[in-house]
Amino acid sequence: MKNIVSWLIPISLGAAFVTSLATASSPGGKICLPTPPDMLGPFYTSGAPLRSSVGKGYVLAGTVRSSAACFPITKARIEFWLTGPDGQYGDDYRATMFSDTSGTYRFWSNSPKPYFGRPPHIHIRVTVDGYRTLVTQHYPEPGTSKAEFDLVLTPEK
């Protein structure tokens, strides 16, 4: 059995955050490991505007997938929230969008800023019928302006 493991290890403010995505061949096809959850944090609020951009300078893109067979999931609701250029959270830096017919998404923002000892990050919450809600965070590598970040969901039982 072949395993392909992709590690992204951004190191910021002395803390290491590891995100991994592995796919393995199986008789039934591919299996994707679920995206690791991360804390919701105290700044989440529902009802963010429907939009794919809250700034310029950083692009986060990827595919929403099922962990069961690694296939793309369409119409997944993806919520983003992050700090603005001043390091503060606010409604101007919240967005809701949906994965497209290929399961992909593309989100434009400013480069997130650190605050209260936390490294720069983008909060993400993904919901879609038939799957467990995913709450995670993306930690940009210092000095980058874009990243690929697949969101792999676990089916409800």
PLM features per residue range, with description:
Residues 1-11:
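Bacterial N-terminal signal peptides that target proteins for export
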Residues 9-19:
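Bacterial N-terminal signal peptides
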Residues 25-157:
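Beta-strand-dominated extracellular/periplasmic modules and repeats
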